[in-house]
Amino acid sequence: MAPIKIGIGGPVGSGKTELIERITRALDGEIEMAAITNDIYTLEDAKILARNSVLDEDRIIGVETGGCPHTAIREDTSMNDAAYEEIVKRHPNLDIVFVESGGDNLSATFSPELVDFSIYIIDVAQGEKIPRKAGQGMIKSDLFVINKTDLAPYVGADLSVMEADSKNFRGEKPFVMTNLKTDEGLDGVLRWIREDVLMSDLAES
């Protein structure tokens, strides 16, 4: 069976790379994982992931998209498709491949032909009104993550407002509030992966 592809999108600095690092560390030994990172002109995210995550370097491929990072995950996915084929060739037993977008705006979405599921992550420092803007990335993602909740008191953000707005535009679709530096809220992300993505015996009772 082909690995499941999970896209991870969000603005620059929201915590996309850190989310992959935390997920792979938590699920290490439980499932087989790899990652593809997209950057406009560098391979910086791939280097950070190789340095900080439990993934071996040959399980990480960096893609230099050039221009608009949105194009590489939506209109022309050929570079990511090639990276996916290469990483599966290296590791045919993979369960999940994460595809991290380059930092993008609130309207960024993944092509359904590129990924099977998508996560969209923002951070509290961008302001409590961000969920209210209901960008396509936040609306269409399978899981919405509001990260860096610890910063709320310092930026004047009301987490209860962000939560209410998220419930309003997400409806029944899940969202999680996290502080990835301490792994607070990470259990919600892991539960979603086990139960909604893998739908296997890994599901927590």
From Swiss-Prot:
The keyword GTP-binding applies. One of its GO terms (cellular component) is cytoplasm. GO terms for biological process: urea catabolic process. CDD domains: UreG (cd05540). It comes from the Bacteria. One of its GO terms (molecular function) is nickel cation binding. Keywords: Chaperone, Cytoplasm, GTP-binding, Nickel insertion, Nucleotide-binding. It is found in: Cytoplasm. InterPro entries: CobW/HypB/UreG_nucleotide-bd, P-loop_NTPase, UreG. GTP binds at residues 10-17. HAMAP family: UreG (MF_01389). Belongs to the SIMIBI class G3E GTPase family. UreG subfamily. Facilitates the functional incorporation of the urease nickel metallocenter. This process requires GTP hydrolysis, probably effectuated by UreG. Homodimer. UreD, UreF and UreG form a complex that acts as a GTP-hydrolysis-dependent molecular chaperone, activating the urease apoprotein by helping to assemble the nickel containing metallocenter of UreC. The UreE protein probably delivers the nickel. This is Urease accessory protein UreG. It comes from Corynebacterium urealyticum (strain ATCC 43042 / DSM 7109).
